[in-house]
Design a protein with these regions (language model features):
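Charge-rich, low-complexity N-terminal segments
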Residues: 3-178
Length: 178
C-alpha cells in the first residue's frame, strides 16, 4: 500500500461535508515595526508613534491533499514575510484619508493635518490604500495582500489577525470564493 493510500480516510463518511480543517500560522518573523498616527473624526490625530506589530493567519478548507496537507505552508509563510517586509521600519500613511493633505515629491512625502506638518523620506514611507491606519484596517490590508496568492488553492476561508500591543489586536476574516 502506498503512502497516499495509507493517509486517505478509510471511510469518506467519517468526515462531515461541512467540516473545515484550520491551519494556524504565527511565526516569530511574521512581524513588522512601524510608525503611524491614528486619525479621529474631529480632525485630531494621535502623535506619531510606533508599534511592534505581529501577524497571525488562519487558513480553512475542507480538502486535504494525498499527504494530508491543506496547502503547502512554505509559500504562504514566504508571502506573509514579504508583506511584513513592505511595512517594516516604515511610516504608515493612509493615502485615502480625507483628513490628510499629502504631497509626493521625488524624494519625500509631505503630510499635513491641521497645524501639523511632516516631511518624510520617500524610502521610509508606506502609502497604504486606507482611510486610516488602525489595526482593523491593517488586518484587512494584509488579508487583501495575502488572499490572491491562495486563489488557486483549496483554502476556502482566510483570517488575518494583526496585534499592535500585547492583548490588543484586530482580525479580518472572509471567504476566498466569490
Amino acid at each position: 500500500m502506498g503512502l497516499a493510500t495509507a493517509l486517505r480516510p478509510r471511510d469518506s463518511r467519517a468526515v462531515p461535508r461541512a467540516a473545515l480543517v484550520q491551519l494556524r500560522l504565527a511565526k516569530e518573523d511574521f512581524a513588522f515595526a512601524a510608525a503611524h498616527f491614528t486619525l479621529f473624526p474631529d480632525a485630531a490625530a494621535e502623535r506619531l508613534h510606533g508599534h511592534n506589530y505581529r501577524v497571525r493567519v488562519e487558513l480553512s478548507g475542507a480538502e486535504l491533499d494525498a499527504l494530508g496537507f491543506l496547502v503547502p505552508v512554505a509559500p504562504v509563510k514566504a508571502r506573509v514575510r514579504a508583506i511584513c517586509a513592505t511595512l517594516d521600519e516604515r511610516i504608515l500613511i493612509p493615502e485615502k484619508s480625507r483628513l490628510l493633505e499629502l504631497r509626493q515629491e521625488p524624494d519625500a512625502v509631505q503630510v499635513s493635518l491641521g497645524g501639523r506638518a511632516y516631511r518624510f523620506p520617500k524610502s521610509e514611507v508606506s502609502l497604504l490604500p486606507l482611510p486610516n491606519v488602525t489595526i482593523e484596517a491593517l488586518a484587512q490590508y494584509v488579508w487583501g495582500e495575502l488572499a490572491p496568492s491562495l486563489a488557486a488553492s483549496p483554502v476556502r476561508r482566510l483570517r488575518v489577525e494583526v496585534e499592535e500591543t500585547s492583548g490588543q489586536s484586530a482580525a479580518f476574516e472572509a471567504d476566498l470564493t466569490s
